[in-house]
Amino acid sequence: MPQAALRLDKVTRSFSQGREVLNVLTGADLAVNPGEIVALVGPSGAGKSTLLQICGLLEKPTAGEVRIGGISCGQLSEDRRTLLRRDHLGFVYQYHHLLPEFSAAENIVVPQMIAGIGRKPALARAAELLAKMGLSERQDHRPGQLSGGEQQRVAICRALANRPKLLLADEPTGNLDPNTAERVFQALLDLVRGEGLAALIATHNPDLARRMDRIVTLREGKVVAA
Ligand SMILES: Nc1ncnc2c1ncn2[C@@H]1O[C@H](COP(=O)(O)OP(=O)(O)OP(=O)(O)O)[C@@H](O)[C@H]1O
């Protein structure tokens, strides 16, 4: 059996809200295999974003274990968590969060240069990803000169720039009109499949969820098969 790209064992997460304790995750187990694209669904407030933040090493669970590519993350120093995030994980959010003063290509070059990749190969990788997303003509445009769908495509390219092994996406097309969302989502799936990486994608849209390899639901703080 290959090592899971992501594995959660008995993950819990509670928040204190005044005198109350809110138990959002109550023992979530999940494995995402290499190359597998998994849809994460569940009603609003079920804890999808919380789960993704924990998988992305942006938040720590109250208890339980998170493994990324077989690496147990619980005892890692902040520096090691940052490196693991940089080298293994890509993130796409509902809002693109692109750098407004930089071109589409530069937005994809920046994270690569932070990871120590030279400017020339970084530019080549940006051009390759933008071409796959049908955005070659737009590579010198700034985000403000792009449509919402184009901006989100650039954000997807940026997330894949450093060749992560796992993509985490939180409602990646939730901010787009239905037709644009449909096209951008298909482009995202094609790119993720083409690059052979694993993905965990939260969505409220059942049609989009059905296009993934498997659907899991968050119910009462646990992950259950849909
Ligand atoms: N930092 C926090 N402090 C306190 N409560 C929080 C915090 N983060 C999330 N919560 C609570 O945890 C619950 C789950 O939130 P979360 O955003 O993970 O749900 P979600 O399934 O992603 O919802 P949506 O589909 O609406 O985005 C909510 O009740 C939320 O208010």
UniProtKB/Swiss-Prot annotation:
E.C. code: 7.6.2.-
Annotated binding of ATP, by residue: 42-49
Keywords of the record: ATP-binding, Cell inner membrane, Cell membrane, Membrane, Nucleotide-binding, Translocase, Transport
Xref: Pfam families: ABC_tran (PF00005)
A GO CC term attached to the entry: plasma membrane
InterPro entries: AAA+_ATPase (IPR003593), ABC_transporter-like_ATP-bd (IPR003439), ABC_transporter-like_CS (IPR017871), ABC_transpr_LolD-like (IPR015854), MacB-like_ATP-bd (IPR017911), P-loop_NTPase (IPR027417)
Membrane topology: Peripheral membrane protein
GO biological process annotation, one example: protein localization to outer membrane
Enzyme's top EC category: translocase
Localization annotation: Cell inner membrane
Tree of life domain: Bacteria
GO molecular function terms listed in the Swiss-Prot or TrEMBL record: ATP binding; ATP hydrolysis activity; transmembrane transporter activity
Family to which this protein belongs: Belongs to the ABC transporter superfamily. Lipoprotein translocase (TC 3.A.1.125) family.
PANTHER family: IMPORT ATP-BINDING PROTEIN, LIPOPROTEIN-RELEASING SYSTEM ATP-BINDING PROTEIN LOLD
Function, as annotated: Part of the ABC transporter complex LolCDE involved in the translocation of mature outer membrane-directed lipoproteins, from the inner membrane to the periplasmic chaperone, LolA. Responsible for the formation of the LolA-lipoprotein complex in an ATP-dependent manner.
Assembly and binders: The complex is composed of two ATP-binding proteins (LolD) and two transmembrane proteins (LolC and LolE).
Protein name: Lipoprotein-releasing system ATP-binding protein LolD 1
UniProt organism field: Rhodospirillum rubrum (strain ATCC 11170 / ATH 1.1.1 / DSM 467 / LMG 4362 / NCIMB 8255 / S1)
Taxonomic path: Bacteria, Pseudomonadati, Pseudomonadota, Alphaproteobacteria, Rhodospirillales
Recorded name of the encoding gene: lolD1
